[in-house]
Amino acid sequence: MAFSAPSLSKFSLLVAISASALLCCAFARDFSIVGYTPEHLTNTDKLLELFESWMSEHSKAYKSVEEKVHRFEVFRENLMHIDQRNNEINSYWLGLNEFADLTHEEFKGRYLGLAKPQFSRKRQPSANFRYRDITDLPKSVDWRKKGAVAPVKDQGQCGSCWAFSTVAAVEGINQITTGNLSSLSEQELIDCDTTFNSGCNGGLMDYAFQYIISTGGLHKEDDYPYLMEEGICQEQKEDVERVTISGYEDVPENDDESLVKALAHQPVSVAIEASGRDFQFYKGGVFNGKCGTDLDHGVAAVGYGSSKGSDYVIVKNSWGPRWGEKGFIRMKRNTGKPEGLCGINKMASYPTKTK
């Protein structure tokens, strides 16, 4: 069953939170996978302890008691949503994470960033798809286990998901081709790839592939580190190695089988609609929640598999390793809709690289 939130007046909250700052700041502890228990939903003191512990875990600080009260109220409302949904769903689950003090509108405004005005760009013809005639596919593929996926990164409050999606795909094909896994620079794309893309205000992966080809490669992250904001382009770095690609290809649109064919050979850049509230608090399982196909977030597909009869795609996100399954999400495939869950089959592409 779902539980009702404890009722507090704003004055009571001010008093309780002010006191809890002194009494509860040392209550950091390990929680269950979802981060709360039923007691937190029915006992105000326990809920305040949970909030303080969550603040400590995620290094949260607020400018005033009033701001803290507001964030506590948002936190409590989000917790009610998480608990309600966990009582309604069974293939995946939600949990508290670093976004628990953000309203859903705040979350969407800060962490999504695919360039919507460019969606009408012409995609490559299906005849260019190099994996079109492949028929013998493995039942599952996980490029993490093959060493072709770099550690999960965190885009922060910069709408640069498109850059992280691009880089993940390039890191993957570079490792597959050369045997070397190098973490590459999203910041270079944000700062320098400005002809069609817009830094922290969104972009598209195909345009980023074009930039990498035209400039002769992408710097490594150590040579051009991430800032979580737009910077000045430092494209011309002498005597610094770049990772190159030969080209890129689009996966045939709205074709689940074609996406799997590509994934059997390399990580793939994909776009999804990630603005659903369940996506904000996804913690684990095979996600099959409500979402449309209004693409707003760039991610990387890094494998596929099946669990308890449910087929899924393994997706690498860019919201840090504490979101989802250590930064990844398993998204249901074979949904019966050509565009796939959350539109994942609509705008997939991958870089190419010759040995």
Curated annotation (Swiss-Prot):
Keyword field: Autocatalytic cleavage, Cell membrane, Disulfide bond, Glycoprotein, Hydrolase, Membrane, Protease, Signal, Thiol protease, Vacuole, Zymogen
Tissue: Mostly expressed in roots, stems and flowers. Confined to tracheary elements, and specifically to xylem.
Signal sequence segment: 1-28
Positions annotated as propeptide: 29-136
Top-level EC class: hydrolase
GO biological process: programmed cell death involved in cell development; proteolysis
A Pfam family hit: Peptidase_C1
Main localization, broad class: other
Origin superkingdom: Eukaryota
EC number: 3.4.22.-
GO cellular component terms given for this protein: nucleus; plant-type vacuole; plasma membrane
Record: glycosylation sites: 180
Active site positions, chain numbering: 161, 297, 317
UniProt-annotated location(s): Vacuole; Cell membrane
Paired cysteines (S-S): 158-200, 192-233, 291-342
One of the record's GO molecular function terms: cysteine-type peptidase activity
PROSITE patterns on file: THIOL_PROTEASE_CYS, THIOL_PROTEASE_HIS
Post-translational modification: Autocleaves.
Family per similarity comment: Belongs to the peptidase C1 family.
Function: Cysteine protease involved in xylem tracheary element (TE) autolysis during xylogenesis in roots. Participates in micro autolysis within the intact central vacuole before mega autolysis is initiated by tonoplast implosion.
Name the UniProt record assigns to this protein: Cysteine protease XCP1
Organism: Arabidopsis thaliana
